[in-house]
């Protein structure tokens, strides 16, 4: 079985960026997703251009910060995206507004000089029933995989692919993670593990309710014990190059 450890939130804060880089250089992270238009975007880009082996996708934003397009249908009265707690309740999104914003974020990413490996989203926003079909079309337009959280089924990528958000908060630990991966190994060819390694900085503490746990994630993801266990159980660490383009391909 192959595993993608994808670090979310690249570009959120400098501490997040530095944590992701350490998890890449000293650990198991080979893939990350960038939040464009966020405070540490340029810092992330500078780091990324020094790390040719780190594959970088786009972490689409619909619940954090301001839209690049200024689309009022996507925001509250202050011009920021609808808060996470209200986002999932809304059913009045305009398809054109969603599409234009997603395209704007992809184009912004490409203008940064980065190679787009795949798409996913902050708070899994792309699985919202109104956003899901639109973001799927955007992924097809740019010929990149889209993180699958049950939207298209287990074989959406032409292989037995599975996304897991198990590695989070109260479930953090080497033993629980390995037990989970070994259970999945019996059923899947490729598993994506969502992770959020970071060094906590003041901005992260201000903007995220999930902060201190990120340093524990970083410790685990750079653990020699974890790396040794993955090797011992014939679990190969990979990135989104194993999914050439969604959904018409095989895991390679």
Swiss-Prot record:
Coiled coil: none annotated. Gene3D superfamilies: Glycoside hydrolase/deacetylase. Its EC number is 3.5.1.-. Keywords: Carbohydrate metabolism, Hydrolase, Magnesium, Metal-binding. The keyword Magnesium applies. GO terms for molecular function: deacetylase activity; hydrolase activity, acting on carbon-nitrogen (but not peptide) bonds, in linear amides; metal ion binding. SUPFAM superfamilies: Glycoside hydrolase/deacetylase. The keyword Magnesium applies. One of its GO terms (biological process) is polysaccharide catabolic process. Mg(2+) binds at residues 59, 122. Its cofactor is Mg(2+). InterPro entries: COD_ChbG_bac (IPR022948), Glyco_hydro/deAcase_b/a-brl (IPR011330), YdjC-like (IPR006879). Pfam families: YdjC. It is an enzyme of class 3 (hydrolase). Probably catalyzes the deacetylation of acetylated carbohydrates an important step in the degradation of oligosaccharides. Homodimer. Belongs to the YdjC deacetylase family. NCBIfam families: PRK02134.1. This is Carbohydrate deacetylase. It comes from Vibrio cholerae serotype O1 (strain ATCC 39541 / Classical Ogawa 395 / O395).
């Amino acid at each position: 079985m192959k595993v993608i450890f994808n670090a979310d939130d690249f570009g959120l804060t400098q501490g997040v960026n530095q944590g992701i880089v350490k998890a890449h250089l000293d650990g198991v992270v080979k893939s990350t997703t960038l939040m464009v238009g966020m405070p540490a975007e340029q810092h992330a880009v500078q780091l990324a251009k020094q790390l040719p082996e780190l594959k970088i996708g786009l972490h689409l934003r619909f619940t954090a910060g301001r839209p690049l397009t200024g689309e009022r249908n996507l925001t509250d009265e202050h011009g920021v995206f609808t808060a996470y707690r209200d986002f999932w309740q809304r059913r009045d999104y305009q398809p054109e507004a969603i599409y234009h914003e997603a395209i704007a974020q992809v184009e912004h990413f490409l203008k940064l000089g980065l190679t787009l490996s795949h798409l996913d989203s902050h708070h899994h926003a792309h699985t919202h029933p109104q956003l899901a079909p639109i973001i799927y079309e955007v992924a097809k337009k740019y010929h990149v995989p889209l993180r699958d959280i049950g939207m298209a089924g287990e074989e959406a990528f032409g292989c037995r692919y599975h996304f897991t958000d198990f590695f989070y908060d109260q479930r953090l630990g080497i033993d629980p993670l390995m037990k989970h991966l070994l259970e999945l190994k019996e059923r899947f060819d490729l598993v994506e593990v969502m992770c959020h390694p970071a060094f906590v900085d003041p901005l992260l503490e201000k903007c995220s309710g999930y902060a201190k746990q990120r340093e524990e994630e970083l410790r685990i993801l750079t653990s020699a014990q974890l790396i040794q266990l993955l090797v011992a159980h014939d679990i190969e660490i990979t990135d989104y190059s194993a999914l050439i383009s969604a959904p018409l391909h095989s895991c390679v």
